[in-house]
Amino acid sequence: VLLLLLVSAVAQESAAPLAVQIRGLIDEYENSVRANTQKIIAATTEEEKNKYRSSIPSAGPYATKMMQLVQANLDQPDVVKAVSWLVTGAANFPEGQEALKMLGTTFADRQGIAEAVKQLEYHGLPAEPVLKAVIEKNTHREEKAAALYALGAIHFKNFDASADRVFGEASKNKALACFQQLNTDYADVTIQGFKLADFAAKMLFEMTNLQVGCEAPEIEGKDADGVSFKLSDYRGKHVIVIFWGGWCHACHGILPLMNQAAAQLKDKNAVVLGVNTDIESEAKKALADYQVAFRNVLDNTTSGPNTSLYNLRNFPTLYLIDPKGLIAIKNGSLDAIVSRILATNNARR
């Protein structure tokens, strides 16, 4: 009887619609991660928390099962959901890498891969052949638009991070070509409710307005006392701008260093200004908790007007604005920025 029940259970599982099997695997994995997270939250000692942190469920076993479903159902429309999950949720496993290759071959012309294709913006240049294949072979608007966006985003990031002028300029031109085609032919396409052209517009703005030598876009708002002020109020001085938030653990360690820099440079024709991205009540708490000694614009969220204008992707982010209001250093280290200010002051003596 037991044997018959087991055979029946296996038969029922294999007979379940493919979409149900895929969703079931994803839910099983996500529920196991969620349950482990709840254990970490509920743990009363650091030792207990570390115990659960070291036992976070791996996506590996689920990736193996998911790839088996893919291989057995290559011609089924719903299988793209499995491929998409492998590419986005199991990218570091062999099955995820295999799915990425399949996305550029077997599934390059399929409908339903747009969300996974968009996520390839985070895979860097190794994803370029896949994205080019989708652009060439796929006739569906969402998929082609997602590939153009992701490829443009990869080239944009290479341009933004490159220290090689020739490589950087080539990357910029490739990004511009992708984004211009996206804006011309697919301006209305949305992925998960967001227009791809809007994301591209932010990167286009950054390429042309947020580079070293550009005039820094105006930063303006109210400080913790409700007093309005602007970046341009400090024209004639070196201005170190830090985008940060109390929610950002990586920001906590640099705040005392920013205070030190503000004190060190106060007689060096330089100031430190912050753009805080917490909601107003949390911002005031963060300013007090970390004893922030420099003036801040309260932007209220990570999508506040100043943070959005500067297209922030990482926190903290530092800029140095020179006395003429031009960007002198972008995404630089505090040490490099302070050294530049001191060197400029010494050169004037």
Residue ranges and their predicted role:
Residues A288-A293, L298-A343:
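Thiol/disulfide oxidoreductase modules built on the thioredoxin-like
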Residues L69-V79, G89-L125, V134-A145, A161-N173, ...:
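Short solvent-exposed coil/turn linkers within tandem alpha-helical repeat scaffolds
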Residues K237-V239, W244-W247, I279, N314:
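Short pre-active-site segment immediately N-terminal to redox-active cysteine/selenocysteine motifs
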Residues H252-Q291, T301-S308:
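Structural microenvironment flanking redox-active thiols in thiol-disulfide oxidoreductases
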Residues R235, F243-Q260:
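Conserved redox-active cysteine motifs that mediate thiol-disulfide chemistry
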Residues Y122, F167-A224, S232-R235, K285-A288, ...:
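N-proximal helix/coil linker or "cap" segments that precede and/or mark the start of modular domains
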Residues R34, S84-A91, K118-Y122, L151-A163, ...:
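Specific register positions within alpha-helical solenoid repeats of the TPR/Sel1-like families, i.e.
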Residues Q12-G60:
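N-terminal leader/linker segments that initiate helical-solenoid repeat arrays
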